[in-house]
Amino acid sequence: CVPLTLDGEAPHDAVVESEQQRQLLVGSDSYFVVRASGQVIELLSDYARVIVNMPMFAVEALGWVIEFLKQFNSRTCQVVLGAGAMRSAGLKNITARHLAIAAQSLSLMMALVPSLRELLKRHLKTTQFVLLSDFDKLQNDFREHQYEIHAKLVSIMGDRVQVHSKALANTDVNKCDGHLQPIQDLVRETGTLFRVVTQFLQPAVVQTISTRVFTDIDMRMSHAITAVDVRTLDAHKLLISDVELLNEKMHAIDASW
């Protein structure tokens, strides 16, 4: 089981500024670039030079590029979903930020593949075009891996929602004189997750994740609120106040809430 948490995803301003300087524009889309992705791009550039300067090796270069990107995809999966980074980098756990950056790195590779394909196509014989279908298979592999990472992000938050909804259902609100901690914790952790995914993932992906997470929050918290034993007017006011806070914070993240 891979330890997955929301910890450590809200970087300080200096870190944010540094990360903004590590963006790569591909077409009209901007991608965050980690060191590993930068090294991959350098190696792909070397392959491109080989293809242009020695077109007689285009078929071989195609195979090298495909195999190289397959290894990148596989290694990314092992490091993040397989928790390889915990062993190689000494991390205590894999955070939502690690997952989001991994997904972004895959998006960058997917954005570069069409250009690589066109470059190779210009240096292949017509009878060799069938080899280009390997790029389609590669893109599908990248996409499937991305879906797994997105699902893991949803799973992280789903686990936290379950914890907080159970805690709320078991809270004696009649003895509380302040905010309900389960709701406070849920608001904080949801905000943390979406600060991360908004920073590193495309808007369409963020929307997909938010829809799934908010559906889970709505269902579980509704059941938990119904289960709360309210016996005093103050307890009722407290519960209503915190539910309104939850709605306000969720709406701030996604206006469709």
Positions of PLM-derived features:
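Alpha-helical bundle/repeat cores within regulatory domains of eukaryotic proteins
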Residues: 211-216, 220, 233-257
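Alpha-helical segments in soluble extracytoplasmic regions
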Residues: 182, 186-189, 193
